[in-house]
Amino acid sequence: GEFRLRIEDTDTERSKQEYTDAILASMRWLGLDWDGELTYQTQRTDRYNEVIDKMIESGHAYWCSCTPEEVEAMREAARAKGEKPRYDGRCRERGLDAGPGRVVRLKIPTEGRVVFDDMVKGHIATDVSELDDMILRRSDGMPTYNMAVVVDDHDMGITHVIRGDDHVSNTPKQILIYQALGWELPVFGHVPMILGKDRQKLSKRHGARSVVEYQNDGLLPHALVNCLVRLGWSHGDQELFSMQELIDLFDGKNLNSSASAFDPDKLLWFNAHYLRETPLDDLARLVLPFIQQKGFTDATEASIEPLVPLYRERAKNLIELADGIAQLLYKSADLPYDEAGVAKWLTDEGKEY
């Protein structure tokens, strides 16, 4: 199979190049290499509009002139009646053309259910009364998330969509778009979100950090990959996997159906293991930048490699390993003394030493 990477950047307010650069750098550091060229959604707006225009022509989509304020009033009225807040479809049969401030909506069926077999959660059915005529193209001409990903997945030949279960509610909407276009559905799988040790939604207070922060904290990339894999997938009782083993053994049937808790201590356990397993020359290369940050700018991989075995058995990350090696370097270095400090703190007897 292929692993394709797509940058979903249609939300221009939340999408910046530095964010994309950080994502790509983090994936490369983790060894998560993708196949083919990167796909940027902002470079495909003509394609999305082509598909949306065809949906309008076929009667599966329509122009809507309702303002956001009018739509909110519809929803408030529905809430007041104890009904599900939704757009009431008043523009469905008006036959409007394009115009300033107008959006394009999907004309969903008026009755029936959307059903699919999730590879993790099993059979899922949603009554169309729970949905409304979702927007496909915003008033600024940009496609919505659900519209863009359906076109992308179809054009990129995506066969399996595996994502967090916070996207389960999007899937019926996307299936309706697939059906309107007459396209074959991919297989959907929704994995549970990772929780903290207290079984609450994972946050920074649980130790969740960005990939760059873990890298700066002296974590090895494969330790992080191994730890994350075990939170969402299993192969018997096996804990440790090489990257090739993960590729060879992965089977969607073994995706966890219940949420797992992230344990920072377990991550350090993985990291300590891979520190001990990493060849000495590779470990010297990895720890060198952390040693140089401590002021030993003349240190080289060759000069510190003999010192690595002295501390790696007890270190949990590269920072701890660098701290241990630095102690030896401090002792062997010809460090200058602060003359003012010597005069202030050392007695005449001490100066003799």
Q: Could you say what each language-model-derived stretch is?
A:
Residues G1-K81, N170-W183, A223:
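N-terminal Rossmann-like or analogous alpha/beta NTP/dinucleotide-binding catalytic cores
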Residues I7, I108, G350-E352:
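Hydrophobic residues in beta-strands and at strand termini
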Residues D9-D11, D155, I162, Y274:
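A generic structural motif
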Residues T12, Q41-R44, P109, G164-H167, ...:
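Short beta->alpha junction loops/turns
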Residues D21, G31, L136, V151, ...:
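Conserved nucleotide- and phosphate/pyrophosphate-binding catalytic cores
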Residues Y62-H190, L195-L202, S210, H235:
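Active-site cores that bind ATP or allylic diphosphates and position pyrophosphate for catalysis
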